[in-house]
A protein has these predicted regions:
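N-terminal Rossmann-like NAD(P) cofactor-binding subdomain of oxidoreductases
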Residues: 1-173
Length: 174
């Protein structure tokens, strides 16, 4: 939802589809009333199978297996894979096999074509050879830009950091 929320005002992006385990009505409510980012300042409506945000209709699917997604028929250029479930090359390849041209993984990934942290190494991206792109971890996205500034201005030979992370489904409490 946050990727869509951050980019919905950009008219150069054609938002085609959202694939989620929940229905369009619930997605519309969650988009409109975000508990962290507040109420969306625009119109959010839904049909049985679509979101309509500021008049832009976005198809809603609920397909669990990426190989069964209609990316080819929908002419999808980029899939934002943010389920946390598909983070290795083999599983993400399913999106490409279904017809997507590129996959951006919103998490650390095993064997992506490249891992990009915006403002740090994004100039290394080559659209001709990088089709599976990882956006690294939330920790990396917080730390790397700061370290880059320190390194560029003062030089960093070694570093150490500690992170305190909120509980997530892949963490063990005990």
């Amino acid at each position: 939802r946050l990727v869509l929320r951050a980019g919905i005002k950009d008219k150069s992006i054609n938002w085609v589809c959202v694939n989620d385990v929940t229905d369009a009505k619930t997605l519309a409510h969650l988009f409109k009333y975000d508990s962290v980012h507040g109420k969306y300042n625009g119109t959010v409506e839904h049909t049985d199978d679509s979101l309509v945000i500021d008049g832009r209709k976005i198809k809603v699917l609920s397909v669990l297996e990426p190989t069964k997604l209609p990316w080819k028929d929908m002419k999808i250029d980029v899939v934002v894979e943010s389920t946390g479930k598909f983070t290795d090359r083999e599983s993400v390849q399913q999106h490409l096999n279904a017809g997507a041209k590129k996959v951006l993984i919103s998490a650390p990934a095993k064997n992506p074509d490249i891992t990009i942290v915006m403002g740090v190494n994004d100039k290394m991206y080559d659209k001709k050879k990088h089709h599976i792109v990882s956006n690294a971890s939330c920790t990396t996205n917080c730390l790397a830009p700061v370290v880059k500034v320190l390194h560029d201005n003062f030089g960093v030979k070694r570093g150490f950091m500690t992170t305190i992370h909120a509980y997530t489904a892949d963490k063990s409490l005990l």
